[in-house]
Amino acid sequence: MRAFSLLALLLPFVAANTHQQCDCWTWSAGGDWIQNADLTHYICLQWPIHTYFDDKSNRCKTVKGSVFYGGLWEENCIEYGTKQGYYPVRTDGTIDTSKKMTVGAATGSCPNRG
């Protein structure tokens, strides 16, 4: 009985960490934190059936019925931004593998609206 009560209490917090749009913010030495459209677009391609990159907001958005989990999105921004590296996406949707990029620090942002 107690476990069920605890689950009912925690469930809203778990559900609150889902979003319809996310982006990556990055920092490099000598600069400020910026919204990184290249990294965001690159990560957005990881889920092609469930997401699309919005050129106007520079955010990755979900298609109807899909959600982002904020923690997983942020992990991907950090992993690809600072460790594995990422590539810019061309306007035709292909990846330009001629220049692998990394940044000094990265984080994810998933605003509730926008």
Stretch-by-stretch model annotation:
Residues 2-16:
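Cleavable N-terminal signal peptides of Sec/SRP-targeted secreted and luminal proteins
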